Amino acid sequence: MNDMLMVIGEALIDFTPTEQGAALKDVCSFTKHCGGAPINIAAAAAKLGARSKVLTQVGADAFGDFILETLSLCQVDITAVKRTKQYPTALAFVALDEKGNRDFTFYRDPCADLHLSAEDITATMFQDCGILHFCSVDLVDSPMKYAHLKAIQLAKEQSAVISFDPNVRLPLWSSEEDCKNTILEFAPYADILKISDDELFFLTGQKDWEHIFTVFPNATIILLTCGKQGSYLMTKKHHLYEKSIPVKAIDTTGAGDAFAAAFLYQLLRDDISREQLPHLSKDILQVYLRFSNAYAADSTTKYGAVHAMATTQEFHEFLQKFHISDVFISDS
């Protein structure tokens, strides 16, 4: 049964400040958290009850140990994670403003995950792959870019759903043009595209989403997140909306990852195949969007990314607190 969520990409340590409203140079202390968008998504899906597996490489160092221990505690399959003594685990330092919005400084050139190669990716890893998710951070010119291409090929051979979140981090690219061109190169592989309003503007120069399928014609479902303005789900038949939930956000790190993970989890929970994606009803898609929107909101009420991802029980409590109903359409 192809019921595994597989993610490929960066694995790093987020150093989150213990105070808000200070510039990075003025922060006195940090707390370390397991991070990287693919890692966040695998952990969140596992916390909700899905099977998830990570394809990446970490250093043979204390930070790599911490990432693997954290993922194991979340019940994420780490059998496809490689270790290397040649390159260190990547690091990111985060500054938070008074509203929990982030500013990143990265230390990842060179780093372990960028040196996972296509030769490290094998067909046996994909035998039970139902969904493959990836982002753009590790699509810079490196061995890992070609590992992505092989992973996508192997996932497609399993008829898996391909999910892509551009997750734009411009400081990691040689130029804005290189970032944009690479994202547009990989977007056609995706059945599901999760994108923020800022990323849509960066890629298209437009904030008008009504013609989004002219830019991404191969996508079956597009998920557009707009922060406090809520979120949208678009297919070629339906345009759906959910308003934001009035939480007190303290850290938005990983909120988009929480949204994506919640959506992908529901597809796995309900055994939705790639062939079924275009035929999902408006009502079911609205439920999926409401669930994802709420799960992302909940994640902003805690510090860190993996740590902030709710378990099913924790999410039930959040839904009750905000009187959100009609979310679950089947038991986990």
Residue ranges of model-derived segments:
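Alpha-helix C-terminal capping/helix-to-coil transition sites in glycosyltransferase folds
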Residues: 127-128, 188-189, 218
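Glycine-rich phosphate/pyrophosphate-binding beta-alpha loops
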Residues: 90, 136-140, 296, 302-305
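Structural alpha-helical scaffold elements that stabilize or flank donor/cofactor-binding regions
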Residues: 124-125, 185-186, 215
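Structural motif
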Residues: 6-8, 131-133, 163, 194, ...
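Conserved N-terminal subdomain of the carbohydrate kinase-like
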Residues: 51-134, 317-332
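Conserved phosphate-binding/catalytic region of the ribokinase-like
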Residues: 1-6, 153, 208-332
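Conserved beta-alpha-beta core of the PfkB/ribokinase-like small-molecule kinase fold
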Residues: 137-211, 229-230
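Glycine-rich phosphate/adenosyl-contacting loop at the front of the ribokinase-like
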Residues: 1-77, 328-332
